[in-house]
Amino acid sequence: VNTPKEVFDDAYIFLMLQFAAIPFTIAYNLLSGQIRALGNSKQPFYFLITASVINIILDGILILGMGLGVEGAGIATWLSQGISVLLCIWFIKKKMQILIPKGEERNFDNKKISILLNNGVPMGLQFSITAIGLIMLQSANNALGTVYVAAFTASMRIKYLFTCVFENIGVAMATYCGQNLGAWKLDRIGQGVRASIRMMLVYFVFTFLLIYPFADEMMMLFVDKGEAEVVTYAAQFMRIANYFYPCLGLLTILRYSIQGLGYSNLSMLSGVMEMIARCGVSLWLVPALAWTGVCFGDPVAWVMADLFLIPAFLWLYKHLKKEVL
């Protein structure tokens, strides 16, 4: 992926540490999904925010304080994800013991496994397809040089801190839509989507008031003050992406709502749209606009996905309402 030779070793170390954290990622998604399924979407969100804040604090301690560099960043991610899993386990044992398997519940049920695979595999493929576009964009950015690699990495860490809220609103909508579909209360689904969009827009205003004036200061959490060029480029990335956060918020709400309604194959196609958009940006926009083109990689992908998801959700919603009638 055109990784510069001078950062290849560090990138390899960080990647290996990320792979080591995969069991924690799987465990968190499994446990938080179970908690949400019982109607509690707040607690997993609080745990995720806690883990994100701990990640940032550990980054400062391990990278700036102890000078561990990329190893410190990887260890911080590893530890913060582990903490989120422990918090989920603690909450289940304390408040939701119904989720702890007992007796025959520990036995495998082939029919239930089949249902889970039918819903889960398309969702997994969706993220894999989206990742192809991200790899293409990363490759195009790496070819620009180490300054841009550092700017991209720093901006992504801050971006994920802010955008995890959109992700959790979407995940909550998946549970909400699934529950109301089971009860055939389709009007509540429409009300929930509208309410979540309003919540998303309020949160967007909050992020704008933070990111637009303070993006440079945020970047200094991960970048040495002496690397002014990296700070400038990373802040530019954050500001451009922030303008399009409503598009990202709408994407997560509609995509997860469609998944909650049982049409994972349909939501997977939005991932294809994202992949096509990022590949197009990598092949044409980055060569023409350099770093500015990279900054528009995510926004273009979000808009393309929305152009598919909006009519797809409206069609699906009308289709389901006709079935009820």
Question: What are these model-predicted stretches?
Answer:
Residues 31-39, 59-68:
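Membrane-water interface regions at transmembrane-helix termini and the short interhelical loops
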Residues 1-21, 65-121, 177-244, 285-325:
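Short alpha-helical transmembrane segments in multi-pass integral membrane proteins
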Residues 25-44, 151-215, 248-270:
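Small-residue-rich hydrophobic transmembrane alpha-helices
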Residues 17-36, 44-52, 73-86, 170, ...:
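Short runs within selected transmembrane alpha-helices of multi-pass transporters and secretion channels
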Residues 4, 40-41, 69, 145, ...:
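Short loop-to-helix capping motifs
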Residues 55, 63, 130, 134-138, ...:
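Juxtamembrane/transmembrane-helix interface segments of polytopic membrane transporters
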Residues 17, 28, 51, 80-84, ...:
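Transmembrane helical elements of multi-pass membrane transporters/channels
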